[in-house]
């Protein structure tokens, strides 16, 4: 009997990527092979995104392609919450499940393509860190599912539910397994990382025989003992974040904080139902930088939110200049089906949204360029992601750069035979542009 094969398409954010990794790991554990193309697959799983309309369309297109090329498709992920929308376009999909519905996906796979008999997962070994879709040297670590906030532009709680934190012992054991597998950078992700453990009332758990609370600070402190890069994403500026800044100042975790501020106008923040006030946030940033001078702050913002006036937008620009954030992403507001913001009055015309986006990015580009110029002459440790095909250049990142969303450090004039992805290098920064740094190699620190 031939081994059944399952094709897999993964769309969406890093949190969805982790969901895909878990499903793939379970498929492998149950004896399935992962097909490299549609033709060789007995069925195809499509993990969808449904956050904004463009992502919904991309997901529907991916389902359509899988149906056309294979014809036996199981749909999961955030868009799976809206089964009617999926079946309206693709009525013959085998099964539709929601986000993080690992067991439902596996039951559907077993139903339509039974697992091979006499499979022994202890003989057909699955790596202890599971199947990963990222390069070997970094990995995403999802610590919770869902969110307790009800931001008016977001439908995540309707797709993924309220906050459910993983037991801290499980989180830390996964992190330790990743380190044993050679991972040198862990990116901590969730919908609201700093709320970790709130739903469990900070329940006591155990790791390596020691008691650890299911709590943001305690988890970060334990992760800091692993001796690898730990990067925090999707953090709200709650008061208890201050204590984690101390860990960064001590070198326990990377001095990098990803906080989606979204706006700075108090009026717009209120319309968004965001749990932060811009003046308090500026004070927080000042305090954090006093504690940890090399702290890098990344954030994302939405311009053209319904009701945003020119005055609101100018408040945002002024705040941006004062905050001097290191890394920034910006999006024009896009209506999301099911978001309560759609019902707000005074929607901003598309041409004004675009004009504000361009003005915003121009201001931030100047801030970013000035900050990177100050790096010239500094010695930094960087992690190599890849090597250029045609040039003697290593594409790397420093502590200030998360993969895929931030800039790179291009280490020039290297001997490519001595360096490979996952190596840690010590470099001197020689030049900079608006988003990237250029460097020369001092030495290879670790391989």
Swiss-Prot record:
Give the co-factor note: Binds 2 [4Fe-4S] clusters. One cluster is coordinated with 3 cysteines and an exchangeable S-adenosyl-L-methionine.
Q: Which organism is it from?
A: Acinetobacter baumannii (strain AB0057)
Q: Record's Gene Ontology CC terms?
A: cytosol
**Listed GO molecular functions?**
4 iron, 4 sulfur cluster binding; aspartic acid methylthiotransferase activity; metal ion binding; protein methylthiotransferase activity
Its function, per the record, reads: Catalyzes the methylthiolation of an aspartic acid residue of ribosomal protein uS12.
Family from the record: Belongs to the methylthiotransferase family. RimO subfamily.
Query: Which GO BP terms sit in this record?
Result: tRNA modification
The cofactor(s) it depends on are: [4Fe-4S] cluster
Keyword Aminoacyl-tRNA synthetase on entry: no
**Residues binding [4Fe-4S] cluster 1, per UniProt:** 13, 49, 78
List the subcellular locations: Cytoplasm
The record places domain Radical SAM core at: 133-370
- What protein name is recorded for this chain? Ribosomal protein uS12 methylthiotransferase RimO
